[in-house]
């Protein structure tokens, strides 16, 4: 752990974390969280300076493993995880980490089909790809915003030439920027 006040590094308690992929960690409720595609995650408890393993179960209506993790982030005090639910990446499942009986669980929140967006934004699909090694999707999820007060849920998507937002509640699209 690094102390910016003292300018020194020091060791904290060790934990075997071979299954963990330390990229794209997210700060949530004062702790740092990492997720891996192997049903394993970890949390660095900042106040106790301790790395804790978190085993979790992802409950989905139709659990199938397709592709990797597409988004892991915090919004409105909630921690979200988004991943594809079919091999072409246009059907997405959204999960929220919640505390249930002193146990953290990923609970299914939304099932979203982005296929209708390809009519307005055909650049969401690659013109050429090898289905053996590649996904046809040509977009990235760069944000998932939840506003509990306004009851708004918005997905922010980066395309090759623009950034768009999709409001789930009133089913509207907005072009945020040309890239």
Question: Language model features by range: what are they?
Answer:
Residues 1-179:
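Short, conserved recognition motifs on repeat-domain binding surfaces
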């Amino acid at each position: 752990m690094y102390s910016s006040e003292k300018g020194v590094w020091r060791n904290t308690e060790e934990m075997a974390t071979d299954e963990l992929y330390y990229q794209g960690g997210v700060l949530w409720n004062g702790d740092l969280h990492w997720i891996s595609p192997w049903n394993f995650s970890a949390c660095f408890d900042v106040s106790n300076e301790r790395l804790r393993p978190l085993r979790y179960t992802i409950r989905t209506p139709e659990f199938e493993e397709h592709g990797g993790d597409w988004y892991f982030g915090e919004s409105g005090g909630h921690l979200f995880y988004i991943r594809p639910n079919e091999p072409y990446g246009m059907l997405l499942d959204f999960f929220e980490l919640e505390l249930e009986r002193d146990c953290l669980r990923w609970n299914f929140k939304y099932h979203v089909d982005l296929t209708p967006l390809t009519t307005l934004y055909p650049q969401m699909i690659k013109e050429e790809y090898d289905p053996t090694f590649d996904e046809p999707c040509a977009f990235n999820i760069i944000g998932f915003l939840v506003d509990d007060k306004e009851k708004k849920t918005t997905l922010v998507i980066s395309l090759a030439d623009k950034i768009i937002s999709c409001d789930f509640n009133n089913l509207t699209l907005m072009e945020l920027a040309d890239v």
